[in-house]
């Protein structure tokens, strides 16, 4: 059994309307969730396939870091799917610096975050003081590198070029998990 702590304001998302989301996670990941809504602690116990069960705590953590339940459940699509977090706070000197860096990661009208998703195929969420990433290893690496470049002060243009390059590399390796608006893969 593993214990995962998530923010209070994400407990409702984890449980879902009438407990629907919680039941879906339990069924898909073959785990049992015991949620303490008082302190945000979630006990995750594997009840079925241990390999799927290992993804249970990651799914809960991903929802806690701002992902929708559907995005978090992508972790079960394939054994290679990863969940990673970039700590914006650790790369910041103070609150104002963190706000500025968060703004750089989001971009004007959310464009930078959108481009990270479009060019890599990963899901990217900025919540609180973290940037969360869900995707295949190459996708996660590309987003993490782009985020670190932006946090280190690289110009947006250079980061977009880097992402285009990674996109083309993945495409040539046949690893393009590109998703198009409308939900068709």
Annotate the PLM regions:
Residues 1-185:
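RNA-contacting regions in translation and RNA-metabolism proteins
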């Amino acid at each position: 059994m593993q214990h995962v702590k998530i923010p209070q304001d994400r407990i409702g998302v984890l449980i879902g309307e009438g407990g629907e989301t919680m039941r879906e996670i339990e069924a898909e990941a073959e785990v049992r969730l015991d949620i303490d809504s008082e302190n945000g602690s979630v006990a995750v116990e594997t009840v079925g396939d241990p390999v799927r069960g290992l993804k249970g705590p990651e799914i809960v953590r991903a929802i806690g870091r701002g992902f929708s339940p559907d995005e978090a459940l992508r972790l079960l699509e394939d054994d290679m799917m990863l969940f990673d977090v970039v700590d914006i706070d650790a790369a910041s000197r103070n609150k104002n610096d963190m706000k500025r860096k968060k703004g750089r990661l989001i971009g004007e009208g959310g464009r930078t975050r959108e481009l990270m998703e479009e060019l890599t195929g990963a899901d990217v969420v900025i919540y609180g003081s973290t940037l969360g990433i869900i995707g295949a290893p190459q996708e996660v690496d590309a987003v993490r590198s782009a985020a670190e470049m932006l946090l280190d002060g690289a110009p947006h243009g250079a980061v977009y070029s880097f992402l285009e390059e990674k996109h083309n590399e993945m495409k040539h390796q046949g690893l393009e998990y590109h998703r198009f608006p409308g939900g068709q893969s």
